[in-house]
Amino acid sequence: MIEQKAVEYSREDEVMKRNMTRRNFVKLAGMAVAFAALPGCATLAADTAVKKPDGKQKVAGTGGERYVPYQERQGAESVVYFTRDLSAAGLLQIYDRVKKDLGGKVAIKLHTGEPQGPNIIPRPWVKELLQKRLPAGTIIETNTYYGGGRDTTEKHRQTLQVNGWTAFTTVDITDAEGTAMLPVPNGKWFTEMSVGKNMLAYDSLLTLTHFKGHAMGGFGGSNKNLGIGCADGKIGKKMIHAGDSGSQWGVNNEEFMERMTESTQAVVSHFKDKIAFINVMRNMSVDCDCAGTSAQPVVTPDIGIVASLDILAADQACVDCVYALPEESRHDLVERMESRHSMRQLTYMKKMGMGNDRYQLIDIDNGDKVITAAEAVKGVKGTWVPDGN
């Protein structure tokens, strides 16, 4: 068990957290990545934070800045479903393809957003999903590591009300009453991860993700939704973002991707086959929904929704769709992905045995035809789907 004193906030951490607004989080995350890119600085945090108990140094993988084309990948293929229908009806239709193992007490992990966040999944879509498919389902969340509208349970509940979630459902802030440790099978950085205690009360998990960019992860898909989103606000998220570096945001690039992925592995391993993944490619700012109203304007066109029982295949399919867009449409989001070395999310998930980076993309709009990512985005233009709330 990780000693509490090794992961608790110090008094200085608490002061820093109070001063860390979501806007500053986005700015400082970018500065941390830029600093790491300077000659001689890329492994500064790792040099002070990656010693194993036996004294050997742990080393993060490389190559996270490089996108691997489909033809260069090897291994089995998973199934990924795809629809262009960005609506409540489209969400229901694609959910039906992956719902078979979701039973008992079902949790729905999604990003409920900072106050007035413009890009989060529309509440009317989620309301219809709950009412028509998951009437006993519960949205789960955790408090944030950075200061803002969700870093305490009290503020988080206020933000849930502001953003319209409490008008039709309740949200379980799973770390409001404490934390629990989950094992990380075959982890390099962790043997355990700290998560919200209440998550363990659920039998199955639907991962409902707004796919978009991310200040530190490059992109935020199902991996980020679980890896950061299920880690509790005070212990788990600090384990990922800071490690033993002594800095609130001391971990970045490939090491950050690996730590986040190991956190996800803890959650996925806990639920075993009672888990499914849906990624909504809509309003894809280069910034995460953590940025709230300060997120960069959306310039990447909306694409559609993917769903799979394979977390890696789901995230890989979204990345492939972005890369299949015309250069002028994908430029900003691709730059964010590559500058943060985000492809290490994908290659590390594969290394950890979490899924396949090859898949059959099933077009449920056209008789379940198997298509390529290029065919999925053919004709996509700069569209904006309104929230409808």
Placement of each model-derived feature along the sequence:
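Cationic, low-complexity basic patches in intrinsically disordered or flexible, solvent-exposed regions
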Residues: 4
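N-terminal and secondary-structure boundary signal
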Residues: 9-13, 17-389
